[in-house]
Amino acid sequence: MSETSPHRSGSVAVIGRPNVGKSTLTNALVGAKVSIVSNRPQTTRHRLLGIATFPEGQLMLVDTPGLHREQKRAMNRVMNRAARGSLEGVDAAVLVIEAGRWDEEDTLAFRVLSDADVPVVLVVNKVDRLKDKTALFPFLAQVSEGRTFAAVHPVSALKRKGLEALVSDLLKLVPEAEAMYGEDEITDRSQRFLAGELVREQLMRQLGEELPYATTVEIERFAEDGALLRIGAVIWVEREGQKAIVIGKGGTRLKDIGGKARLQMERLFGAKVFLETWVRVREGWSDDEAALKAFGYD
């Protein structure tokens, strides 16, 4: 954009199936970690606003849970509702897919966007992982056939490649307006919420396939004590056997999870953190709408 271009500001929903890199893309555009990431599908469970500020304008990026077909448990239904609800009132949307792959859940995400009547930018992520680079353009042609996109951008969110052109096109789709947030603001979520997410991220990263799906984190205490933040985090599971998995032999796994989460908090919050963690059991919470609401699910 030229220096005489008007300032633009608007909201953009980031939509796609699980594990395509929506949160990595959001973090890359914001320039800071506002959404947790892991290799585990459905890492993102809540809508989260990431604020990306540029000289030409500001993009309010609504990171969302991955749209998926599974509807059996209440938590699956809640996450799908959160993803669909993120499209209300946005100026544009980004459909994130993985380079070289389009499946039924990508089709589901596209249909949801088609019903929303907003301009859609297709972001083809993870192009750095394509072994045969010549396969990219035939894949783009195949995906674009019979589907309308405002723009198509191959990117690597992890390596921050192709993002400048993407930002330029997204800013063209939002209205002329002043920024709604200050330059130093990166999310509308509280530090308390982010603390819980950072603990959950370490659970996913360290337990991998061992991690029970029905695991969530509740921050019971978040208090400033001079220059120190005192945080108490409860990890909820559904069975005693799952509790033992999270704690690990002699408590070593829980200690490691807490230690790594604390370092992430100190980096994000810019303050020393004293973190305590506990593991508790609440049977059937992931299929209980009231329990989900109590734990902060939309």
Swiss-Prot record:
**G3: region residues:** 63-66
One molecular function GO term is: GTP binding
The answer to whether UniProt assigns keyword DNA repair to this entry is no
GO CC term, one of those recorded: plasma membrane
Q: Where in the cell is it found?
A: Cytoplasm; Cell inner membrane
Give membrane topology per the record. Peripheral membrane protein
Please list where the region (G4) is annotated: 125-128
The KH type-2 domain extends over 199-283
Specify one Pfam family. Answer: KH_2
Q: Where in the numbering of this chain does the Era-type G domain appear?
A: 8-176
Residues that, per the record, bind GTP: 16-23, 63-67, 125-128
Q: Which GO terms describe its biological process?
A: ribosomal small subunit assembly
Q: List the disulfide bonds.
A: none
| Signal peptide residue numbers | none
The UniProt annotation puts the region (G1) at: 16-23
NCBIfam families assigned to the protein according to its UniProt record, in alphabetical order: era, PRK00089.1, small_GTP
What interactions and quaternary structure are annotated? Monomer.
Please report the name of this protein according to its UniProt entry: GTPase Era
Gene (name only): era
